[in-house]
C-alpha cells in the first residue's frame, strides 16, 4: 500500500494590479484595480475555483510620494475580506494587522467577527510594522525599536488568544421562557496585566466557528523566527534559494519543538513570483516586458527602503553594493540581510539588485512553463524547504488565472494538491485542530 503524497499548501497574495512594481504600467492592468470591489470579487472566485487554501491581503499604515502604486490607495483589509466572504464559501480569508499600532481588543474583535462572517475562514498575519514613518500617524515621533516591537507582539498575541476564549462554546442559552440569555459560568474575564498592556475582557463576540482564527507570522529575523516558532500556525517568508529555504525550514521546526509544539502543525510558505508561459522563451519575454517598465529612480528607492533608508546615490549603479550593517537598522532585518546575501552570492551590481528586488520585493522569481513550476514546487516541498507557497502574481488578473488554469491541474494530476475542498474552515484546510477553550471543563 503506497502512502499518500505530501499535499502542497497554496495561498494567493492579492495586490492591486500585481506584485511587480511596474505592473500598473502594463497595458493589460486595470487602472482602478486597488479600489475596485468587483475586480477583487473575481480574483477571489478564481482562487476558490482553483481550490486554493487562502487569500492573503497585506497592509501598511504609512505612505509617502515614493510608495508602491498598489499601496497609495487601497481598501482596508477587514472591510475588503468581509465583502469577499459573501462571494466565496471555502477559501481562507487572511490579512495583516500590526501589533505595534493596534490594541489587542480591537484585533481580537475584528478577526472574531470575520471568522463568524465567513463561517470559519479567518486568519491573522501578525506583523510589527517596519516603516519608520508609521509612528507619525499614531501620535508618535519615533518607531519602536526592533526587539521591543517583538516583545510587544508576543504579549499582544497571547492577549488576543485569551480574548478569543472569553466565551465557551455553549455560553449563549437565549432561553426566552426563563429570560436567561447566557450562562454566567461560561463567560470569562481575561484580567491581563503585563509589560505593555492591561486588558480585562471579556470580548463582546462569541466563540468563533474555528474556536480561534489561524495565526500567521511573516518575520524572518531572529526575533521574528522566535515569535513564529512560538505562536504561528502558518509562516510566510522570503526565500530565494533551495538551500537557504531548507535551513530556514529546519530552524523553525526545531525551535517550535523546543517550545513544546508539534512541528508538523506549522506550515511554512515562502512567497513565489511566477512568470508563466507555454515556453521558457515566452516566459522570459513576459518577464523582460515587466522589467523594462521599471523606472530606475523607483527601483533604486525600493532597494534603499529595504536597506533601512540608506542613500546609495553616491555609489555607481554598475558597481557592487557597499558593506552595510543590518543590525544597525530599525527596518526589516531579515529582508536587509536577504538583499545583502543575494548581492554577495550572485555578485550583483546595484542596478541588477534593484531591478531584481523592485520586481519581486526579494521573493523567489520563477520564469518558465507550468510543468517546470510544478516541478519546482514539488522539489521544494519534497526536500523540506517548505510546506507550500504563497503565490504572488506579478500581473493581475492574468497571473492568478494562468496559475489556476494551467499549474493547479498538473499538481492535482500528480496527487499533490486536492481536486476538491475536504473541509470548510481554514483550520481544516491546514489540518489544524480546533483549539480547546482554556476554561472548558
Swiss-Prot record:
Which is a GO BP term held by this UniProt record?
cysteine biosynthetic process
Disruption effect?
Cells lacking this gene almost lose the ability to grow on 2SC as the sulfur source but are still able to grow on sulfate. Moreover, they show a massive accumulation of N-acetyl-S-(2-succino)cysteine when S2C is added to the medium.
Which residues participate in FMN binding?
Answer: 59, 96, 146, 150, 220-221
Could you tell me the EC number(s) of this protein? 1.14.13.-
What is the top-level taxon of the source organism?
Bacteria
What reaction is this protein's catalytic activity? N-acetyl-S-(2-succino)-L-cysteine + NADH + O2 + H(+) = N-acetyl-L-cysteine + oxaloacetate + NAD(+) + H2O
Result for mutant: residue 125 to L/V: Loss of catalytic activity
One Pfam family of this chain: Bac_luciferase
Cite the annotated pathway.
Answer: Amino-acid biosynthesis; L-cysteine biosynthesis
Q: Which GO terms describe its molecular function?
A: monooxygenase activity; oxidoreductase activity, acting on paired donors, with incorporation or reduction of molecular oxygen
* Cofactor(s) this protein cannot do without: FMN
* Keywords for the protein's UniProt record, in alphabetical order: Amino-acid biosynthesis, Cysteine biosynthesis, Flavoprotein, FMN, Monooxygenase, Oxidoreductase
Q: Which InterPro entries match?
A: Diverse_substr_monoxygenases (IPR051260), Luciferase-like_dom (IPR011251), Luciferase-like_sf (IPR036661), NTA_MOA (IPR016215)
Write out the similarity annotation: Belongs to the NtaA/SnaA/DszA monooxygenase family.
**In the UniProt entry for this protein, what further remark is given in the free-text comments?**
The substrate N-acetyl-S-(2-succino)-L-cysteine arises from the spontaneous Michael addition of cysteine to the citric acid cycle intermediate fumarate.
User: What is the annotated role of this protein in its UniProt record?
Assistant: Catalyzes the oxidative cleavage of the C-S bond of N-acetyl-S-(2-succino)cysteine, forming oxaloacetate and N-acetylcysteine (NAC). Is involved in a S-(2-succino)cysteine (2SC) degradation pathway that allows B.subtilis to grow on 2SC as a sole sulfur source, via its metabolization to cysteine. Shows almost no activity on S-succinylglutathione and 2SC.
Subunit text: Homodimer.
Q: What is this protein called?
A: N-acetyl-S-(2-succino)cysteine monooxygenase
Give the species: Bacillus subtilis (strain 168)
Amino acid at each position: 500500500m503506497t502512502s499518500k503524497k505530501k499535499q502542497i499548501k497554496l495561498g494567493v497574495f492579492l495586490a492591486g494590479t500585481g506584485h511587480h512594481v511596474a505592473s500598473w504600467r502594463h497595458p493589460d492592468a486595470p487602472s482602478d484595480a486597488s479600489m475596485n470591489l468587483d475586480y477583487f470579487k473575481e480574483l477571489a472566485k478564481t482562487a476558490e475555483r482553483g481550490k486554493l487554501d487562502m487569500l492573503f491581503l497585506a497592509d501598511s499604515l504609512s505612505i509617502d510620494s515614493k510608495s508602491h502604486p498598489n499601496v497609495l490607495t487601497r481598501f482596508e483589509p477587514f472591510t475588503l475580506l468581509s465583502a469577499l466572504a459573501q462571494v466565496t464559501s471555502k477559501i481562507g480569508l487572511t490579512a495583516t494587522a500590526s501589533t505595534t499600532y493596534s490594541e489587542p481588543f480591537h484585533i481580537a474583535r475584528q478577526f472574531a467577527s470575520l471568522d463568524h462572517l465567513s463561517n470559519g475562514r479567518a486568519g491573522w498575519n501578525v506583523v510589527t510594522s517596519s516603516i519608520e514613518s508609521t509612528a507619525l500617524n499614531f501620535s508618535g515621533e519615533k518607531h519602536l525599536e526592533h526587539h521591543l516591537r517583538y516583545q510587544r507582539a508576543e504579549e499582544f498575541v497571547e492577549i488576543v488568544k485569551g480574548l478569543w476564549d472569553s466565551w465557551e462554546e455553549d455560553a449563549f442559552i437565549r432561553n426566552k421562557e426563563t429570560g436567561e440569555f447566557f450562562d454566567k459560568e461560561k463567560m470569562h474575564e481575561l484580567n491581563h496585566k503585563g509589560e505593555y498592556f492591561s486588558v480585562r475582557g471579556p470580548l463582546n463576540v462569541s466563540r468563533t466557528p474555528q474556536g480561534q482564527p489561524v495565526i500567521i507570522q511573516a518575520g524572518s529575523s531572529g526575533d521574528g523566527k522566535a515569535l513564529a516558532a512560538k505562536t504561528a500556525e502558518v509562516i510566510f517568508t522570503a526565500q530565494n534559494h533551495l538551500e537557504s529555504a531548507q535551513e530556514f525550514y529546519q530552524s523553525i521546526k526545531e525551535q517550535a519543538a523546543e517550545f513544546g509544539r508539534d512541528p508538523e502543525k506549522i506550515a511554512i510558505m515562502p512567497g513565489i513570483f511566477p512568470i508563466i508561459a507555454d515556453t521558457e522563451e515566452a516566459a522570459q519575454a513576459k518577464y523582460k516586458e515587466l522589467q523594462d517598465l521599471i523606472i530606475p529612480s523607483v527601483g533604486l528607492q525600493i532597494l534603499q527602503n529595504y536597506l533601512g533608508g540608506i542613500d546609495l546615490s553616491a555609489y555607481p549603479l554598475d558597481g557592487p553594493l557597499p558593506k552595510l550593517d543590518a543590525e544597525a537598522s530599525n527596518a526589516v532585518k531579515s529582508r536587509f540581510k536577504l538583499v545583502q546575501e543575494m548581492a554577495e552570492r550572485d555578485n550583483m551590481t546595484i542596478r541588477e539588485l534593484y531591478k531584481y528586488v523592485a520586481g519581486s520585493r526579494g521573493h523567489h522569481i520563477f520564469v518558465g512553463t507550468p510543468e517546470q513550476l510544478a516541478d519546482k514546487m514539488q522539489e521544494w516541498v519534497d526536500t523540506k524547504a517548505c510546506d507550500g507557497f504563497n503565490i504572488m502574481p506579478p500581473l493581475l488578473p492574468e497571473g492568478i488565472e494562468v496559475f489556476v488554469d494551467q499549474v493547479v491541474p498538473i499538481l492535482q494530476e500528480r496527487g499533490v494538491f486536492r481536486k476538491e475542498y475536504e473541509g470548510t474552515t481554514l483550520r481544516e484546510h491546514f489540518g489544524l485542530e480546533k483549539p480547546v477553550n482554556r476554561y472548558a471543563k
